[in-house]
Amino acid sequence: MGNCRSKQESHPICPNTQTPEPTEAEFRRAAVNSLYGRYNCKCCWFADRNLINCSDHYLCLRCLNVMLRTSNLCNICWKPLPTRISVPTEPTAPSE
């Protein structure tokens, strides 16, 4: 029963190991107001500050780090996660 081995073809684990192009997202310190209120992290639903735009939703930095540890795809939209973050210069005082 378990003594004979079946012929198995040797398949490489990752035949096409290509590094995906880094995707860039914009960092938001405060969430943008929308018609239905403030945006939140779509993963934990608690964070409304320090959000990263991921295709059609926002993720907080904590959830983004957790997702990047396991995979390079988003668990919500199944698109590549942003790996580069661009921080726009935000004014600290109103312009005169």
Swiss-Prot record:
Molecular function terms from GO: RNA binding; zinc ion binding
Subcellular localization: Virion; Host cytoplasm, Host perinuclear region; Host cell membrane
Zinc fingers (RING-type) by residue: 41-77
Motif segment (PTAP/PSAP motif): 91-94
Region span, Disordered: 1-21
A GO BP annotation: viral budding via host ESCRT complex
Family: Belongs to the arenaviridae Z protein family.
Name of the protein in its database record: RING finger protein Z
Organism of derivation: Cupixi mammarenavirus (isolate Rat/Brasil/BeAn 119303/1970)
Higher taxonomy: Viruses, Riboviria, Orthornavirae, Negarnaviricota, Polyploviricotina
